[in-house]
Amino acid sequence: MSLSVEAKAKIVAEFGRDANDSGSTEVQVALLTAQINHLQGHFAEHKKDHHSRRGLLRMVSQRRKLLDYLKRKDVARYSSLIERLGLRR
């Protein structure tokens, strides 16, 4: 299940540079993090849903790539984003 339009708009407003900034790296990582967190709750109930688990692993990989890109380009923005999202790195 994907995020609602309202949830996406809230994330874009919080992490974007303006209300229509859906393409910046920070927004993309925040949207992927929200989807990943939503799917983790799904897997607590549906342990054998391997088809969706593959999608989850793909999202985690995409988020990792975006975070690596951001770390290469701007370490300060990377550190700020990690702290705001509460990721382990």
Swiss-Prot record:
Pfam short name (any one): Ribosomal_S15
Superkingdom of origin organism: Bacteria
GO cellular component: cytosolic small ribosomal subunit
Keyword S-adenosyl-L-methionine attached: no
Matching InterPro entries: Ribosomal_uS15, Ribosomal_uS15_bac-type, uS15_NS1_RNA-bd_sf
Keyword Ribonucleoprotein listed: yes
Gene Ontology terms describing biological process: translation
GO molecular function: rRNA binding; structural constituent of ribosome
This protein's UniProt keywords: Ribonucleoprotein, Ribosomal protein, RNA-binding, rRNA-binding
NCBIfam families cross-referenced by the UniProt entry: S15_bact
PANTHER family: RIBOSOMAL PROTEIN S15, BACTERIAL AND ORGANELLAR (PTHR23321), SMALL RIBOSOMAL SUBUNIT PROTEIN US15M (PTHR23321:SF26)
Known role: One of the primary rRNA binding proteins, it binds directly to 16S rRNA where it helps nucleate assembly of the platform of the 30S subunit by binding and bridging several RNA helices of the 16S rRNA. Forms an intersubunit bridge (bridge B4) with the 23S rRNA of the 50S subunit in the ribosome.
Quaternary data: Part of the 30S ribosomal subunit. Forms a bridge to the 50S subunit in the 70S ribosome, contacting the 23S rRNA.
Sequence similarity: Belongs to the universal ribosomal protein uS15 family.
Name this polypeptide is given: Small ribosomal subunit protein uS15
Source organism per UniProt: Edwardsiella ictaluri (strain 93-146)
